[in-house]
Amino acid sequence: MAKVLVLYYSSWGHVEQMAKAVAEGARETGAEVALKRVPELVPDEVAKQFHYKLDQEAPIATVEELADYDAIIFGTPTRYGNMASQMKQFIDQTGGLWAKGALVGKVGSAFTSTASQHGGQETTLTSFHTVLFHHGMVVVGLPYSFAGQNGVEQVKGNSPYGATTIADGDGSRQPSEVELDGARFQGRHVAGIAAKLAG
């Protein structure tokens, strides 16, 4: 049985919803799944002023625990085509793990949310993949065997690089069912590969 960590940052809850779907998909394989988040860097008064979702139940992860999992699926909103600073700050603390090769051979994957359809989803995911490659992880995306990422009949996220959702500029759009299905698929896919690699 693979041990999977779904680790995310979410300002307004879109990535949180996707993270829960990813975790749900991973659990369907029989994996032992933990759902955690990285610390918030925005001061409380600012977060309240901008209506951040402050009631997220997932516990805060520690950098050291990343080595305990067979797979880590990272979720982050997009900030100018890159991961959010909260996630980057957490990742930047993994130098000790890198020095020990603690994540080499583990499965790594990522998912994201953007305000618009062309708001940097794929650049965020591929830049995240670069981090995973530096750690020696086996990078897994969202294959085209997930048919929900095909077609143009509706506005929707998802790409071969990972599950995605589109929040709209004011955050009013919530993840659609096909986007959540993509997240579940990615969770199942990553957990299945991790189980095979873990033996």
From Swiss-Prot:
<feature type="binding site">
    <location>
        <begin position="10"/>
        <end position="15"/>
    </location>
    <ligand>
        <name>FMN</name>
    </ligand>
</feature>
<dbReference type="GO" id="GO:0008753">
    <property type="term" value="F:NADPH dehydrogenase (quinone) activity"/>
</dbReference>
<dbReference type="GO" id="GO:0016020">
    <property type="term" value="C:membrane"/>
</dbReference>
<feature type="binding site">
    <location>
        <begin position="78"/>
        <end position="80"/>
    </location>
    <ligand>
        <name>FMN</name>
    </ligand>
</feature>
<feature type="binding site">
    <location>
        <position position="134"/>
    </location>
    <ligand>
        <name>FMN</name>
    </ligand>
</feature>
<keyword id="KW-0288">FMN</keyword>
<keyword id="KW-0285">Flavoprotein</keyword>
<dbReference type="GO" id="GO:0010181">
    <property type="term" value="F:FMN binding"/>
</dbReference>
<dbReference type="InterPro" id="IPR010089">
    <property type="entry name" value="Flavoprotein_WrbA-like"/>
</dbReference>
<feature type="binding site">
    <location>
        <position position="12"/>
    </location>
    <ligand>
        <name>NAD(+)</name>
    </ligand>
</feature>
<comment type="similarity">
    <text>Belongs to the WrbA family.</text>
</comment>
<dbReference type="GO" id="GO:0051287">
    <property type="term" value="F:NAD binding"/>
</dbReference>
<dbReference type="GO" id="GO:0050136">
    <property type="term" value="F:NADH:ubiquinone reductase (non-electrogenic) activity"/>
</dbReference>
<dbReference type="InterPro" id="IPR005025">
    <property type="entry name" value="FMN_Rdtase-like_dom"/>
</dbReference>
<keyword id="KW-0560">Oxidoreductase</keyword>
<protein>
    <recommendedName>
        <fullName>NAD(P)H dehydrogenase (quinone)</fullName>
        <ecNumber>1.6.5.2</ecNumber>
    </recommendedName>
</protein>
<dbReference type="InterPro" id="IPR037513">
    <property type="entry name" value="NQO"/>
</dbReference>
<dbReference type="Pfam" id="PF03358">
    <property type="entry name" value="FMN_red"/>
</dbReference>
<keyword id="KW-0547">Nucleotide-binding</keyword>
<dbReference type="GO" id="GO:0050660">
    <property type="term" value="F:flavin adenine dinucleotide binding"/>
</dbReference>
<dbReference type="GO" id="GO:0050661">
    <property type="term" value="F:NADP binding"/>
</dbReference>
<feature type="binding site">
    <location>
        <position position="98"/>
    </location>
    <ligand>
        <name>substrate</name>
    </ligand>
</feature>
<feature type="domain" description="Flavodoxin-like">
    <location>
        <begin position="4"/>
        <end position="190"/>
    </location>
</feature>
<dbReference type="InterPro" id="IPR029039">
    <property type="entry name" value="Flavoprotein-like_sf"/>
</dbReference>
<dbReference type="InterPro" id="IPR008254">
    <property type="entry name" value="Flavodoxin/NO_synth"/>
</dbReference>
<feature type="binding site">
    <location>
        <begin position="113"/>
        <end position="119"/>
    </location>
    <ligand>
        <name>FMN</name>
    </ligand>
</feature>
<keyword id="KW-0521">NADP</keyword>
<keyword id="KW-0520">NAD</keyword>
